[in-house]
Amino acid sequence: MDKNAKSIVIYFSAQNHTRNIATEIAANINADIFEIEPVEAYTEDDLSWTDSESRVSREHNDVSLQDIVLKSVSVPNWDEYETVFIGYPIWWGGSAWPVDSLVKKVDFGNKIIIPFCTSHSSGLSTSDTDLKAKAASGNWQPGHRFSQDATDTEVKDWIQSL
């Protein structure tokens, strides 16, 4: 990773786990940060994946509900960034739908895209390559999975490995 390249960390976080990692990454590389925000925010009840009537369960079972309307898909000063970190929680083995919605709408051009995810128990799976397939452009790098309680040291070690 070019330490002189201007970077941004873009993330969606339903329960602050991904936000914590995103904030740590941004602080360590002096990057800007942009939160992906659905117009209709997810509540704790919405996120109850064991409840077949919860919002995420309905969205999981009906893909037509997975195109989430976002407050903004326009990242300020987008053209200035060379490197983009994209963070998301894992939902049903893939990236959270608000991230998918953003990735489908943004032109990444020749930017370097570095995905990262958080999960209590699921792995990265193919979420990084699935996002690449949904994007129209970008130089996508392999993703990295953090546990939801990853330490600052784990984040710093990963950044150093890039």
Region roles according to the model:
Residues 1-83, 93-95, 100, 104, ...:
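N-terminal beta1-alpha1-beta2 submodule of the flavodoxin-like/Rossmannoid cofactor-binding fold
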Residues 117-122, 148:
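Short beta-alpha junction loops
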